[in-house]
């Protein structure tokens, strides 16, 4: 990566501004999944071990008006982080003002402070989300000229707490998590060890058009599963029953198939049910066609076998999107089958592009078998699409 990283700067005695991604799920004030906090620990620990004073920024959820602040404070995150670090985390509970400034100025080397939810600034004219110039300058002024961006999950957004601060400091550098995310995903797409197989699932073709186009150029094979299968089926005149379809994307699907040169591999059968919820019948289709009155909710056993075959010998695999409605045990087999086919390949570099696929790997007990699981759904999608991420572009060149 041609950008400066946290290891390239002297941190001792410095007030170091750090953008982390602590956008964790909360239920009644309790964190239900702390993966993102854990993922940020190496960078935070490095800064404090080097004698820096870490000033952390993160958003949590969406905040548009005063009422939205309810339940969106980072206070539970501060407590969880303190427990993980084994030291106090200063939490002034504000995003600006004398209370924050005094707390920052009182920090000693090796101490950590967490600023309140950056999106609280969105109540006043979306200042965080619209990268308000004054806000970026103000936050930048709280440190000593060094900004560490370790929030891959928001790297595809130009906000005051990433791009805004970057523009107003002497050195904007990547943290370890951001560095790893870029290394794994970008290298997989740009300089993969071959054969390189991409697997794309999920419900909508519209979400993945750019990704499919980019990966058709880069990968040796692109396997398609999930609900978007049926838009590709209908585009070819295959019966899809009541399956999900994007009527306005049929031409796009047809075009992708025509220009794929046989690289695009679709399922050959489905697991169908007579309703999405409250169904009374679940069965495998004979071939591609879905029965009248039924809808496809997972890829079928023949497809699992075909995908297993297509993955044989793969050295690089990027997977984004489940093969079916994996939250329901009746429609998990496709996602499990594909995961198992990926991880059994000898010497494979296997990467999950965040979002639902990451949730599937974690919930179905396969997470530790993958080389890398991305922490950013939208950001990893844009990298897979070949886009430049604003949060990354704003960092200082080496």
UniProtKB/Swiss-Prot annotation:
It catalyses: (2R)-3-phosphoglycerate + ATP = (2R)-3-phospho-glyceroyl phosphate + ADP. It is found in: Cytoplasm. ATP binds at residues 208, 296, 327, 354-357. GO terms for biological process: gluconeogenesis; glycolytic process. It holds the Pfam family PGK. One of its GO terms (cellular component) is cytosol. Its EC number is 2.7.2.3. The keyword Cell wall biogenesis/degradation does not apply. It comes from the Bacteria. Keywords: ATP-binding, Cytoplasm, Glycolysis, Kinase, Nucleotide-binding, Transferase. InterPro entries: Phosphoglycerate_kinase, Phosphoglycerate_kinase_CS, Phosphoglycerate_kinase_N, Phosphoglycerate_kinase_sf. Substrate binds at residues 21-23, 36, 59-62, 119, 157. Pathway: Carbohydrate degradation; glycolysis; pyruvate from D-glyceraldehyde 3-phosphate: step 2/5. One of its GO terms (molecular function) is ADP binding. Monomer. Belongs to the phosphoglycerate kinase family. This is Phosphoglycerate kinase. It comes from Streptococcus pyogenes serotype M1. The gene is pgk.
């Amino acid at each position: 990566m041609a950008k400066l990283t946290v290891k390239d700067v002297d941190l001792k005695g410095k007030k170091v501004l750090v953008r982390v991604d602590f956008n964790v799920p909360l239920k009644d004030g309790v964190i239900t999944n702390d993966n993102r906090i854990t993922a940020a620990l190496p960078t935070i620990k490095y800064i404090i071990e080097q004698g820096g004073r870490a000033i952390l920024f993160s958003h949590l959820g969406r905040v548009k008006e005063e009422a939205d602040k309810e339940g969106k404070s980072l206070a539970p995150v501060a407590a969880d982080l303190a427990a993980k670090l084994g030291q106090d985390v200063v939490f002034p509970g504000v995003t600006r003002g004398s209370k924050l400034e005094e707390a920052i100025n009182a920090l000693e080397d090796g101490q950590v402070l967490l600023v309140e939810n950056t999106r609280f600034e969105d109540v006043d004219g979306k200042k965080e989300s619209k990268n308000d110039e004054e806000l970026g300058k103000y936050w930048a002024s709280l440190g000593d000229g060094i900004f560490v961006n370790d929030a891959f999950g928001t790297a595809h957004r130009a906000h005051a707490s990433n791009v805004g601060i970057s523009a107003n400091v002497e050195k904007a550098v990547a943290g370890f998590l951001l560095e790893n995310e870029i290394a794994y995903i970008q290298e997989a797409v740009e300089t993969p060890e071959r054969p390189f197989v991409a697997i794309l699932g999920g419900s909508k073709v519209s979400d993945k058009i750019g990704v499919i186009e980019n990966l058709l150029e880069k990968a040796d094979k692109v396997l398609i599963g999930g609900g978007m299968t049926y838009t590709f089926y209908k585009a070819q005149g295959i019966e899809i029953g009541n399956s999900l379809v994007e009527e306005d994307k049929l031409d796009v699907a047809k075009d992708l198939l025509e220009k794929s040169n046989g690289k695009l591999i679709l399922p050959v059968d489905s697991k169908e049910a007579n309703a999405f919820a409250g169904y009374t019948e679940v069965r495998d289709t004979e071939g591609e066609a879905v029965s009248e009155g039924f809808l496809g909710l997972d890829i079928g056993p023949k497809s699992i076998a075909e995908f297993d075959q297509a993955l044989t010998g793969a050295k690089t695999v990027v997977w984004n999107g489940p093969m079916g409605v994996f939250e329901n045990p009746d429609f998990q087999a496709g996602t499990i089958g594909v995961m198992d086919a990926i991880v059994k390949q000898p010497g494979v570099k296997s990467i999950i592009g965040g979002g639902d696929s990451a949730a599937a790997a974690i919930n179905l007990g396969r997470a530790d078998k993958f080389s890398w699981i991305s922490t950013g759904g939208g950001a990893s999608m844009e990298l897979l699409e070949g886009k430049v991420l604003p949060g990354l572009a704003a960092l200082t060149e080496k």
